[in-house]
């Protein structure tokens, strides 16, 4: 009944989510859903938002409770913790630097960074002053990155000199130099020395210098209020059918959907709230996967984000699928997420977690990216039973880059069936449709969302008249319904 209400009374449901999370805006909004249309739904007209503002409103309370904002490690064993005040100060310092370089609201900032705290700092700095964020992982080569960044014409490029992965260092200075040469829109390059303290490129600024400021301006800095639908970030489709689609999501829609998913369905509370055990959220991802964006959402309500940069399976010479588990055990992770393939590899390697007593902090396991097999789920459940955690909860989700969220996910109140997902998410009118556009149960169909969501793409960057957007999502069926491309065919139940 609750799900049906949430998908038939969209205005009332999303207003209740706004109220539940006490979302802030200096200006009032007309209604949650002003125009119910697909495409073209209009949400919270009149409201203002800023993703970074929602993050930092929890900084003081989380810090006072003694919890860090970010805990990170890499495969070389470098352990770092970033406090909430330091996260805010560094983001403010970089934001002021970006403004001094001429960054205006709506300008794009491209990042070529690994999954380290500096990437989160850079994101918060960019969006706090209205810049539009876009990131590619450093495991991508020049051509793949340019296929994405050339479409959005970034004004500023933030890039690293290289990364460590699989037991080896991978220099990326030449890739960065080639990118800058091929992107005439770039007016300023910020170089993060991730491998070599002496790395440099001509006419670049050291990232460390941009986050070093600590004065009255950084102390008083606050993210600017933006229109609810101001562009937040640009993410990309896989590019298997042409150039990757540059998908634009807005501040307000992204943060409200992320909060509903993370708190109501993933059951991830805030670090400083009573009875949430000092919540520590980890979802293994590179910065090139939308799950990095999902990991970021932990900051939206004061959760500690616990991130790992490196190969989860060790190296080619020394494979070790206990790497991430040891990382989680050593850092008190409470929610441990990864792609379903990770759990399949752990099963295949026949690893034993019984000696990692620190894993008793974990109270939930999350999976996505591909179907999780029954055998892999049973393996994980048995491992945690041996650790003294019977019936560990699995939060298996199906989502998409396209709408920065999930359609199907977890519910602690429902039974677990190995290899299956528990429920359709609140607010997501998800069905399986046959070729005639009719809903089907127990049969193969296309995964369809038949009602609008606040986090639907605003548009594709540079897509004149929304032609590419419409053909991607709204050509298959009549009556203006959209489907998640790449959602896969599967039996509906």
Predicted feature descriptions by range:
Residues 31-32, 55-83, 193-199:
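AMP-dependent adenylate-forming
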Residues 76, 159-228, 349-351:
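ANL superfamily adenylate-forming
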Residues 80-85, 223-226, 232-256:
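Conserved AMP-binding A3 loop
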Residues 110-113, 119, 123, 127-179, ...:
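Short beta-strand->loop structural element characteristic of the AMP-binding/adenylate-forming
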Residues 114, 156-175, 308-312, 331-379, ...:
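Adenylate-forming
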Residues 253-280, 288-334, 349-350:
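Conserved AMP-binding/adenylation subdomain of ANL enzymes
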Residues 363-365, 372-493:
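Conserved AMP-binding/adenylate-forming
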């Amino acid at each position: 009944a609750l799900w049906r209400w949430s998908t038939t009374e969209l205005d009332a449901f999303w207003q209740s989510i706004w109220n539940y999370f006490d979302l802030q805006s200096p200006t009032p909004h007309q209604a949650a859903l002003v125009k119910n249309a697909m495409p073209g739904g209009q949400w919270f007209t009149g409201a203002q938002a800023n993703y970074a503002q929602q993050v930092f409103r929890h900084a003081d309370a989380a810090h006072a409770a003694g919890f860090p904002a970010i805990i990170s490690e890499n495969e070389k064993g470098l352990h770092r913790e970033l406090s909430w005040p330091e996260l805010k100060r560094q983001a403010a310092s970089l934001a002021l630097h970006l403004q001094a370089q001429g960054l205006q609201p709506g300008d794009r900032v491209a990042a070529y960074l690994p999954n380290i705290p500096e990437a989160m700092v850079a994101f918060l700095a960019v969006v706090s002053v209205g810049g539009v964020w876009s990131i590619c992982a450093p495991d991508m080569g020049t051509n793949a990155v340019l296929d994405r960044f050339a479409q959005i014409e970034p004004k500023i490029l933030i890039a690293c000199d290289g990364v460590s992965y699989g037991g080896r260092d991978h220099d990326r200075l030449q890739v960065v130099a080639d990118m800058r040469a091929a992107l005439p829109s770039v007016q300023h390059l910020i170089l993060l020395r991730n491998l070599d303290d002496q790395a440099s490129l001509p006419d670049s600024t050291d990232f460390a210098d941009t986050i070093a400021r600590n004065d009255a301006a950084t102390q008083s800095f606050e993210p600017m209020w933006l229109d609810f639908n101001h562009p937040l970030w640009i993410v990309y489709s896989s590019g298997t059918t042409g150039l990757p689609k540059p998908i634009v999501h807005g501040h307000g829609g992204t943060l409200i959907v992320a909060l509903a998913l993370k708190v109501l369905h993933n059951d991830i509370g805030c670090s400083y709230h009573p009875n949430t055990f000092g919540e520590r959220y980890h979802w293994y991802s590179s910065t090139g996967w939308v799950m990095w964006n999902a990991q970021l959402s932990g900051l939206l309500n004061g959760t500690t984000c616990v991130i790992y940069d490196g190969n989860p399976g060790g190296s080619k010479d020394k494979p070790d699928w206990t790497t991430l588990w040891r990382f989680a055990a050593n850092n008190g992770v409470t929610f441990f997420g990864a792609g379903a393939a990770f759990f399949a590899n752990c099963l295949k390697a026949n690893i034993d977690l019984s000696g990692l007593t620190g894993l008793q902090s974990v109270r939930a396991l999350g999976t996505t990216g591909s179907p999780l097999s029954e055998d892999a789920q049973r393996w994980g459940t048995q491992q945690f039973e041996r650790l003294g955690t019977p019936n560990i909860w699995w939060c298996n989700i199906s989502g998409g880059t396209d709408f920065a969220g999930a359609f199907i996910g977890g519910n602690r109140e429902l039974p677990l069936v190995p290899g299956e997902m528990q429920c359709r998410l609140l607010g997501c009118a998800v069905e399986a449709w046959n070729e005639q556009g009719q809903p089907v149960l127990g049969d193969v169909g296309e995964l369809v969302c038949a009602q609008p969501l606040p986090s639907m793409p605003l548009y594709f960057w540079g897509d004149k008249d929304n032609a590419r957007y419409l053909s991607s999502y709204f050509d298959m069926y009549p009556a203006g319904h959209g489907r998640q491309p790449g959602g896969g065919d599967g039996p509906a139940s």
